[in-house]
């Protein structure tokens, strides 16, 4: 979320706001709200330090501040997670659905599994396929559901053996 203008009213509950300003003046206020994705606490802290450094170098006669709120914890790759992924890959191949490779951490979002990642092996991304994720235009391709459900069920079965 990015809002800027002479007057800015931001509602954290709805992640929305209203602004007023003119195009021929410099905005008096700007509010930016977003999330950081990281695979380790070290990476998170390094990134935050760099962002603080940038914010501290604001222009003369201006002020800037930055705050961070932890949300999803880091979930770095582990041997256990890669073993679960290898099982999913084999299940997918056995079902004729093709191989499954790790998704680039730079392109993924946060995952609920991150909250228990320190305590158990797991993977994310077993859900539906579609487009427009996390937007009002989000769609789900229902034709993929049966294959994904079957693949997940077989993975769970094989993990118990």
List each language-model region with its residue ranges:
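Metal-dependent amide/peptide-bond hydrolase catalytic core
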Residues: 1-161
């Amino acid at each position: 979320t990015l809002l800027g203008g002479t007057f800015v009213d931001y509602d954290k509950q709805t992640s929305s706001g209203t602004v007023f300003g003119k195009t021929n003046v410099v905005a008096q206020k700007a509010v930016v709200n977003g999330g950081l994705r990281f695979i380790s606490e070290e990476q998170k802290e390094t990134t935050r330090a760099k962002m603080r450094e940038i914010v501290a170098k604001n222009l003369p006669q201006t002020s800037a501040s930055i705050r961070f709120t932890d949300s999803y914890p880091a979930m770095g790759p582990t041997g256990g997670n890669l073993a679960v992924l290898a099982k999913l890959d084999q299940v997918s191949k056995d079902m004729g659905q093709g191989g499954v490779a790790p998704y680039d951490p730079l392109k993924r979002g946060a995952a609920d599994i991150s909250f228990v990642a320190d305590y158990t092996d797991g993977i994310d991304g077993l859900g539906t396929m579609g487009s427009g994720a996390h937007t009002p235009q989000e769609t789900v391709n229902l034709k993929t559901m049966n294959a994904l459900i079957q693949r997940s069920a077989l993975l769970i079965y094989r993990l118990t053996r």
